């Protein structure tokens, strides 16, 4: 009997490449995010954000360490430049642990967003396999018109988290349609 490989996880935007393996990985509710020691300075912020997001999304308690990853750990590391991955691409491998590697810290961050989506959609059971993923478009964003309706700062912060979750990299806030005639002679080119 042949066991089928896992299908491509459904995330937004869709993964560019997926090579499924057999089985799933269930991460523990308490675990470690392990940073490659040579990349600690570059990836500490990403690891901290991931700890917060795992707590908020899954209710999990993760701690950040450095060193080599063990079974069920989440490992973050920078990799050599890769022309196809570019500045925002990453490789996410799921076997007996989760490994996210990318040429840049931004790529590792986007890899953590994919991991969060997979955990959310697959109810904490991750399909084993490897993805190489990179954005199709350099600018991925959203515009919010706050000139016509008031939005709280907390709402705007929440929107930034949503954008991050879906790997968008631009947030345009339309503040005002009014010029300032007393300062710029009512000239839009000067405003």
Language model segments and positions:
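Acidic, contiguous N-terminal accessory segments
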Residues: 1-135, 140
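Short strand-loop junctions, especially beta-strand C-caps/beta-turns
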Residues: 36-38, 145-147, 176
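Extracytoplasmic/secreted cell-surface and envelope-processing proteins
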Residues: 42-43, 152, 180-183
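Conserved strand-to-helix beginnings and helix N-cap segments that scaffold or border functional pockets
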Residues: 44-47, 153-157
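Structured core elements
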Residues: 99, 143, 172-174
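The substrate-binding groove and active-site-proximal loops of carbohydrate-active enzymes
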Residues: 101-102, 140-153
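Catalytic domains of carbohydrate-active enzymes, especially glycoside hydrolases
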Residues: 155-178
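Aromatic- and acidic-residue-enriched carbohydrate-binding clefts of CAZyme catalytic domains
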Residues: 178-191
């Amino acid at each position: 009997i042949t066991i089928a490989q896992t299908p491509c996880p459904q995330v937004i935007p869709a993964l560019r490449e997926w090579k499924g393996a057999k089985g799933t990985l269930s991460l523990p509710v308490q675990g470690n995010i392990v940073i490659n020691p040579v990349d600690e300075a570059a990836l500490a912020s990403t690891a901290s954000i991931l700890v917060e997001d795992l707590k908020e999304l899954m209710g999990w308690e993760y701690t950040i360490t450095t060193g080599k990853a063990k079974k069920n750990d989440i490992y973050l590391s920078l990799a050599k430049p890769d022309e196809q991955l570019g500045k925002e691409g990453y490789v996410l491998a799921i076997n007996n642990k989760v490994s996210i590697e990318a040429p840049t810290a931004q790529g590792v961050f986007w890899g953590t967003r994919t991991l969060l989506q997979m955990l959310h959609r697959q109810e904490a059971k991750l399909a084993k396999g490897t993805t190489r993923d990179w954005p199709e478009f350099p600018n991925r964003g959203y515009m919010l018109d706050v000139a016509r309706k008031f939005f709280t700062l907390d709402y705007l912060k929440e929107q930034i988290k949503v954008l991050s979750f879906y790997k968008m990299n631009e947030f345009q806030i339309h503040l005002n349609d009014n010029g300032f005639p007393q300062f710029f002679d009512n000239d839009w080119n000067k405003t």
